[in-house]
């Protein structure tokens, strides 16, 4: 299973095409729209989210609420397009309009300058329109489809915010996926710790007042995962590696870790490895989950626990020093409409990309042509691993 996305931030809209879904899987537009709505929320979002009310149009691959096994095409309209029709026109425009909203002063930390050099764009709007995090709208749409597939197989995904601007949630126990879903949805910053959430919101407000931005850390937990997804046989078959790639592919994300993550470097092996248990009721389990649900690049039946770190958004309302690519003189960087903090929304995007990789791994391991046989094979595999 794979997908491609297309579209610019201020173009007519965004498109994704998914190939490889099994036939007969239940899927409605509402399954996607509820995830798009979640992505638009969160304390710290900018004015753009008051304009866009994202709704998906499914244009291919579904009939009467079920997938056909053919490519699924989805489109999300940009409501703000009406204000950008000339600037972002697909057809040629009069010469006097060609330089409207031209960007020649790249923003530090963004794709502007390097993208311009790579593709020869002397108007870096051609770069920023595609590199914008607006593209994650259709990544969330694709992830919503993956989450639906996983849900039907008894696998659930939830994300939440662990840290914003140096304030970290004080979590003294592990949370079930259902708890994470319920508690995070009730928080303006998608945080499980109400006290920390208040401090996070204050830091976001302070950053906005100062024309600055702040980043943070999100965590995604996947429960109900069968053992044996991914493989140790080749480096590029390891599922944790694929998930790590997916996490750092999200706009502004700079790192990923599983389980205790980088803390493992400061602990002896006896405090990191997860002891193996067995019972007739549950089969093989682990006493702890320090490795985040992975051993040898494969799922071990414990919940997947992965975290990603998001840098502060590079668009600053008090811009940093840059250079005009025309004159080579020093100027302040360009300013585009932006959020002061998008970490809460990014947790939804992280859910989507993790769900996608897990769904792909499921379809790689089991027959993926028909959804009814897929469900049967997953259940048979669960029983086999339990009886091993």
UniProtKB/Swiss-Prot annotation:
Pathway info: Metabolic intermediate biosynthesis; chorismate biosynthesis; chorismate from D-erythrose 4-phosphate and phosphoenolpyruvate: step 7/7
GO cellular component: cytosol
E.C. number: 4.2.3.5
Alphabetical keyword list: Amino-acid biosynthesis, Aromatic amino acid biosynthesis, FAD, Flavoprotein, FMN, Lyase, NADP
NCBIfam families from the UniProt entry: aroC, PRK05382.1
Record note on quaternary structure: Homotetramer.
Family: Belongs to the chorismate synthase family.
Function: This reaction introduces a second double bond into the aromatic ring system.
Protein name per Swiss-Prot or TrEMBL: Chorismate synthase
Organism: Listeria monocytogenes serotype 4b (strain F2365)
Gene behind this protein: aroC
